[in-house]
Amino acid sequence: MNSDYSLERADGFQGPIVISDPDNEDEKQLAAFYYAEEIIFLQDWYHQDGDTRHAGLDSVPFIWIGYAQSFLINGGGIFAPCLTVGEDSIYDSTNPVWKPMACAADCSVIENYIKTITVEPGKTYRLRIIGAQELIGVNFAIQNHNMTVVEADGTIVEPFAVENLDIMPGQRYSVLVTFDKEVGTYLATTGVRYRSQSPTGYILFKYQGAGEGVPSILEDEVNNPFQGTAGFSTAVPPHPVWNDTEPTIALESKLFTMNTDYFPDYSYITQNDDSLVRRIVIAGNQLTQNSTGKLRWAANNVTSMMGAAPMITIAYDAVTTDGALPWPGTKIPGTLIVPDKPPSKFIVSDCLGRIL
């Protein structure tokens, strides 16, 4: 779960839940275009427990949690130092050095840890890609196979083809993939986005009738546990450079809903002609709160302090009282408008977790 209200916790039981509306006509029409569906569940896995990471993030001075030690796809992955440095090593991202640990005796048997999805040749599958990462945004791609994006965060969109796809924490996409290449086993990987390092995630797509074993490129790839600071991965297929924003902008510029009936209230945005030519710039930054010494996220130099009740509860009560106008006609108590130009002074508001 990606949290927008407080610190999230990534310990314990995790997994996907897909809730479908059997009466949704868009979903019914989409279902005619694919043979079956599979889940791609993405996770960055920290080897420290959540309490330890939480304590560091909430301390003064701030202690950064660093990069995850492993990346999992559908719960499987490899902590590559087991393969390259021996049975008594672990990567310490804060130093960085190798430190003693015990690795599983069968760690070198790649098939034991990397998951495999078996597909029928010539069939089209819907892949529900779920970004369950705690921190790291990634780019997902399948060796020698393009993807067609058909759904984003539960909304059916106009289809468009991509070679790879950015998945940030909390995001969900559905893509259609036709497995019409030469029968074999193909590697899919993740590449880090907007961070200079991250372990790589792996999953295999195996055509029915393919031989045993894994692609030789995978044997080489697991010997490179972290993508270097230059941001290039040795994985096949290639991913964008970690700090290249163009692929993300291009992706989001193509996202258009198939059914505008889902947004009946959008017209209020265009009631004022000025709204069509207004440019709003929101800059996110981290600042130190003088009273506590803690780091805080801010938007245009304005940050927020959480109240006792969730903001959604306060907002609901405000707009459902007698005589209240629909938002934004009714002001939400404890909130303020982010200024269009950042104030020179850092402002701490008493709003409830979100600035409107």
Regions found by a protein language model. Give the residues of each.
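Short acidic, flexible loop segments centered on an aromatic residue
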Residues: 131-148
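Exposed beta-strand and adjacent loop surfaces of beta-rich binding modules
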Residues: 124, 135-139, 355
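Beta-strand-rich extracellular modules
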Residues: 4-6, 132, 191-193
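Acidic-aromatic/histidine active-site loop/patch
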Residues: 36-123, 130-133, 295-297
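Extended terminal and domain-junction accessory segments
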Residues: 10-58, 160-355
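Asparagine-centered strand-capping/turn motif at beta-strand->loop junctions
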Residues: 129-133, 350, 356
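Short aromatic-acidic-glycine turn motif
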Residues: 25-27, 146-156
